Curated annotation (Swiss-Prot):
It comes from Enterobacter sp. (strain 638). The chain crosses the membrane at residues 6-26, 36-56, 64-84, 88-108. It is a multi-pass membrane protein. This is Spermidine export protein MdtI. It is found in: Cell inner membrane.
Amino acid sequence: MQQFEWIHAAWLAFAIVLEIIANVFLKFSDGFRRKWFGLLSIAAVLGAFSALSQAVKGIDLSVAYALWGGFGIAATLAAGWVLFGQRLNRKGWIGLVLLLAGMVMIKLA
């Protein structure tokens, strides 16, 4: 395992934030009918992958990708709830708990 440095964690956090922004812009784009939001979504995805590429210089790829994806899903779910009134059903909540448990297990491995 690589030695932990805060700069790589910061890059990972930035990648997560950009992924959430990309997903919100994608929703606002309404299937790319609102092109500016669609283009902003693409730019945010490119930025997220660029930030992730910096994060994996100091964080194992498997850990960084799992955390990026997992936190991105959980935070996008929260954004969907706050911004769009989207709610999870019982199965969705179970899936979210399993996702979070999996992220913890990967980090502890």
